[in-house]
Amino acid sequence: MKKLKVSKMEILVRYGEIGLKSDPIRKNLEEILRKNIIKLLRKYEIDAEVKILHRKLLVKINTKDKEDLALKLLKKVAGIVSYSPVYECPLDINEIVSFAVQIMKKKLKTLNKEKVTFAVKTKRSYKKFPFTSVEVNKKVGEAIVEKLGLEVDLENPDIVLGIEILNDGAYIFTEKYEGIGGLPAGSQGKVLCLISDGIDSPVAAFMMIRRGCRAVLLHLKMSEEALNKVRKIVEVLSDYDTELEFVVYDYKKDIEDIVEKLKSIKKENYTCIFCKRKMLKVAEKYAKYLDCDAIVTGDNLGQVASQTLKNLRVISENINYPILRPLIGLDKNDIVKIAKEIGTYEISTEKEIKCPYLPKHPKTIAKPEEVKKIKEKVKLV
């Protein structure tokens, strides 16, 4: 029997809906995912080899002392559903049993507990392996009970020993980390995301990256303070999309022009409406120039004055690009939860920067005909 020796960490990566695609599309998505893993690890000076297996990927970490960092980074790769540090062994039932016992013995040393229970869960993707999943579970479980004296608990075990039988070997593990799921970034086109220092827009950008888009983040600058916060947010999001682009447009003159013109006709309550219309017009120009396929905003229905359904209609009416609003139906608590999980919440809330141009009584139900009259009267977009 071979002794358990590990010189380099190996991580088995699992994907979800990629596996539902046709073979040509699946293979293309697997390759994009493979490259995205390598790019993110290289960003942190981690050398790795990524091999495509049967509906899974295997990541071999070549840089010592950065294995824990590599495990954290894989959490940020869109397309990964789960992953596990694994021990690889030959497709031989005796070798699998031997490796499993050694792995469990090693795992026990990390637990400060007298009575330890376990369960064995095998997935046999390689159907030519002569033992079924149930038979592997039984043989491995019996050996662990006999040699280590542990008790089986299939309902709530302290340790779950996982075994994946693939056509090139068996992969055994005791840890399973959750990924963010979705599709590999870059597989579904490019979007232009309006980004501010608030909670919502970074989450909207993340959700589009998770669905396979490359993102261009456009910040409409109104203050240096807000821009500095946005730069920190962009740095966080750049882990989720290693090809992320960031663009800054000086918006202060535009908003001041809007406010001045609306004041001249005593229609200051329409400030948010015309501000958002102008923002989308600027976004549309950048989207065309940068060859993006859609515009993304952090709008959440009913959250603020400009995000009522009536207002969203008049805000969007003169834009010829698709406008995607991934947060539109979420509760605020759901958005906050995602922001905390992806690492942008603390930055967004470190100091609230209120909009100095917000009117006392913003218009919540704007009529298209009224907006048209104002637009034509003071020459706004």
UniProtKB/Swiss-Prot annotation:
InterPro entries: Rossmann-like_a/b/a_fold, ThiI_AANH, ThiI_fer, ThiI_N, THUMP_dom, THUMP_ThiI, tRNA_STrfase, tRNA_sulfurtransferase_ThiI
Pathway linked to the protein: Cofactor biosynthesis; thiamine diphosphate biosynthesis
Domain THUMP: 68-176
Record keyword ATP-binding present: yes
Alphabetical list of PROSITE patterns matching this protein: THUMP
Top-level EC class as recorded in UniProt: transferase
Any one Gene Ontology molecular-function term assigned to this protein's record: CCA tRNA nucleotidyltransferase activity
EC number: 2.8.1.4
Substrates-to-products reaction catalysed: [ThiI sulfur-carrier protein]-S-sulfanyl-L-cysteine + a uridine in tRNA + 2 reduced [2Fe-2S]-[ferredoxin] + ATP + H(+) = [ThiI sulfur-carrier protein]-L-cysteine + a 4-thiouridine in tRNA + 2 oxidized [2Fe-2S]-[ferredoxin] + AMP + diphosphate; [ThiS sulfur-carrier protein]-C-terminal Gly-Gly-AMP + S-sulfanyl-L-cysteinyl-[cysteine desulfurase] + AH2 = [ThiS sulfur-carrier protein]-C-terminal-Gly-aminoethanethioate + L-cysteinyl-[cysteine desulfurase] + A + AMP + 2 H(+)
Predominant location: cytoplasm
Record keywords, A-Z: ATP-binding, Cytoplasm, Nucleotide-binding, RNA-binding, Thiamine biosynthesis, Transferase, tRNA-binding
Annotated compartments: Cytoplasm
Residues binding ATP, per UniProt: 194-195, 276, 298, 307
NCBIfam families: tRNA uracil 4-sulfurtransferase ThiI
Protein family membership: Belongs to the ThiI family.
Alphabetical list of HAMAP family matching this protein: ThiI
Entry function: Catalyzes the ATP-dependent transfer of a sulfur to tRNA to produce 4-thiouridine in position 8 of tRNAs, which functions as a near-UV photosensor. Also catalyzes the transfer of sulfur to the sulfur carrier protein ThiS, forming ThiS-thiocarboxylate. This is a step in the synthesis of thiazole, in the thiamine biosynthesis pathway. The sulfur is donated as persulfide by IscS.
Name recorded for this polypeptide: Probable tRNA sulfurtransferase
Organism of derivation: Methanocaldococcus jannaschii (strain ATCC 43067 / DSM 2661 / JAL-1 / JCM 10045 / NBRC 100440) (Methanococcus jannaschii)
